[in-house]
Amino acid sequence: MSVRIAVLGAGNMGRGHGKRLEAAGARIVAVCDRSAAARQKFKEEMEETDIKEYWDFDEMLEKEAFEGLFICLPPFAQDGQFEKAAKRGKHIFIEKPIALDTETGKRMVKTAQENGIITRVGFHMRQGEAVKKLKQLIESGKTGRPVLFYGHYACNSLHTPWWIQVDLCGGQIFEQAIHLYDMCRYLIGEPKSVTGIMNNLCHGNTARYTVEDVSASVSLFGNGAAASITANNCEIPGIWKGSFKAVYEHVTVEFEDHNHAVFTYTDREQPETEEVSSEADAYEDEVREFLMCIENGKDTSCNITEGYKSLCFVEAVVESANMDGIKTAVKK
């Protein structure tokens, strides 16, 4: 039987996930969005012809029968929908960041655990083919101990009106660079402390632009490893870039992105290189994993607890930056 799905948020991300859901064999039964035009566009782009429309989330939750909910809302629009659905036993896929503060995130984790639901957070980079290969090497012990992580996120865009306002999106670290902070955790380990800086250097004359457009952090991990992650919104217009490098005792891996990387093995007399290149759709992979876990009753590889831990990481970066770079402990 096809997994029945409801989608909350009919924007670009919601429509993209909708198409991948249908490609994976799920049945979309309902879509909820405050915009009638967005709901209509969502329905027009789906193959399913009997998708119910809702303006009110509570009404959709009350009237529709579905197993899984996709929450594809901007950070500011998330207002307890996760907890309401969890208490009804709905399995939930939620985009990052899961919340704008860790206290809310902690409540979400608690509610999910108390109600035994399956969750998945949209950190799609974990599903990249090059990332998967490195993770396998880590788990086999072939990389040796982790040493250092470098990450760089760059773009130059005003995106959408809500994105440029820090009270609505949390800032670039929260809304975009969090992908690299999550990747750092995934490949290196859990951070102990961080020192962060951030500023707005390129958009001082842009109306309502209150998010940082440049940031940098240095982190220390429980296993002794370190990380340096930078982000900015001042580089090349039309190009979004998230590159990173992971250094281990026996291998160094340079990632152009999550699907493309060069592995240099240093545990031999002459270093050897191996290139991994793939055009696989990491978004599709995370959607399929979520559906499979619902069908099999198993937890996903990136559940709400993982989303909370990465939220704690970026919150500590911002807290440090707001205190002029004072070393700040990362919550557990």
Question: Where are the regions that the model predicts?
Answer:
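C-terminal glycine/acidic-rich active-site capping loop/insertion
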Residues: 124, 221, 234, 241-312, ...
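Rossmann-fold dehydrogenase core element
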Residues: 105-124, 144-151
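Hydrophobic residues in well-ordered beta-strands that form the structural core
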Residues: 94, 119-121, 150, 229, ...
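Contiguous beta-strand/loop segments that form the cofactor/metal-binding neighborhood of enzyme cores
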Residues: 175, 182-260, 287-298
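N-terminal Rossmann-like dinucleotide-binding module
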Residues: 1-48
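Beta-loop-alpha module in the N-terminal Rossmann-like domain of NAD(P)-dependent dehydrogenases
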Residues: 17, 49-111
